[in-house]
């Protein structure tokens, strides 16, 4: 009997050691897994295609990622509070069309006797995005409309407003000052990449170093406890949708400036890419858990994947399948972590 106990002890100790090793690896994989995946993907693509690591291609990847990255950062604020914003793609189109129309008409003397201010169209585009986000936030926070329903309605409404405002036609011939935000550069670095980096830095600071950021996590972690502790849950929820709308407005102007015309059909399904970047980056759809840095890495992973598949000649249809699989896998991983806890 004693021998059986002694014989069983090493096996138990081994299991304990294996559990300890798993516990050690788990947090590391959870925190840096997406970054490791991005690095591995870059290494594989650089081996398969020698043009992948060229400076021109890297700049191209970052430029293409900037729009989705900006949208995803705004989406992160919303998802951290247990919300969702399905309207960002339509807001991209609306902000682009409205701001571009002012960039064109102001320059051609649409406002008699008024000087043309290069910043005016940008301010109008930003305000348009904030207004759309604020309306969604009002519906969610003040009238308790489910976020999915409120933003789905805004998706349709904003797209309709875009078509009405533009007459269903693109708005071309933008001024050089407006196009600079999409095609210009500073010290050789494209402006969209710089804006993406600045928005990331500011958002990271807000979420990690400010009271508002702590309140966002508190509302997402436990809304009832946050309310009991004196936090204005409705104001926080309203604010995050306004932030998402503002960043969608910026993304819309960058897109219009880069393409040289504002298309009323722009931004279709952009919300899916943004949600994918957030979820792949480790932010929980249940709220309260996530980081902007993870979202940025998630956006980069999607951008690198799309670019790599393009270089390999893979059709875009397959890219959508892979992207969908990544989203499902990321959600399954998040659910499994919660089950273990």
How should each PLM-predicted stretch be described?
Residues 1-41, 228, 232-235, 307-341:
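Cytosolic-side transmembrane-helix boundaries in multi-pass membrane proteins
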Residues 31-36, 61, 68-69, 90-94, ...:
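Hydrophobic alpha-helical transmembrane segments
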Residues 80-135:
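Membrane-embedded helix boundary and interhelical linker motif in transport proteins
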Residues 248, 258-324:
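Transmembrane alpha-helical segments in multi-pass inner-membrane proteins
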């Amino acid at each position: 009997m004693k021998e059986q106990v002694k014989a069983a002890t090493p096996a138990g100790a081994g299991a304990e050691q294996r559990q300890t090793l798993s516990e050690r690896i788990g947090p590391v994989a959870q925190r840096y897994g997406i970054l490791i995946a991005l690095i591995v993907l870059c290494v594989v693509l650089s081996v398969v295609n020698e043009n992948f690591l060229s400076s021109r291609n890297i700049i191209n990847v970052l430029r293409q990622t900037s729009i989705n990255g900006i949208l995803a950062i705004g989406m992160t604020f919303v998802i951290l509070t247990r919300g969702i914003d399905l309207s960002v793609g339509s807001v991209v189109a609306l902000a682009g069309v409205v701001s571009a129309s002012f960039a064109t008409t102001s320059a051609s003397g649409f406002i008699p006797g008024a000087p043309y201010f290069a910043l005016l169209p940008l301010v109008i585009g930003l305000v348009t995005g904030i207004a759309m986000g604020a309306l969604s936030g009002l519906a969610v926070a003040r009238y308790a409309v489910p976020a999915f329903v409120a933003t789905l309605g805004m998706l349709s409404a904003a797209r309709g407003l875009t078509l009405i405002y533009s007459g269903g036609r693109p708005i071309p011939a933008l001024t050089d000052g407006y196009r600079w935000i999409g095609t210009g550069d500073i010290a050789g670095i494209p402006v969209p990449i710089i804006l993406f980096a600045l928005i990331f830095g500011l958002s990271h600071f807000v979420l990690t170093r400010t009271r508002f950021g702590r309140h966002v996590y508190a509302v997402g972690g436990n809304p009832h406890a946050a309310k009991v502790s004196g936090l204005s849950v409705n104001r926080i929820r309203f604010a995050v949708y306004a932030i998402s709308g503002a960043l969608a407005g910026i993304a819309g102007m960058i897109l219009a400036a880069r393409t040289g015309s504002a298309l009323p059909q722009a931004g279709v399904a952009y919300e899916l890419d943004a949600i994918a970047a957030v979820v792949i980056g480790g932010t929980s759809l249940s709220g309260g858990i996530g980081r902007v840095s993870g979202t940025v890495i998630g956006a980069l992973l999607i951008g690198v994947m799309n670019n790599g598949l393009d270089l390999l000649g893979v059709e875009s249809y397959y890219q959508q399948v892979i992207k969908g699989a990544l989203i499902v896998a990321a959600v399954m991983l998040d659910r499994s972590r919660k089950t273990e806890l």
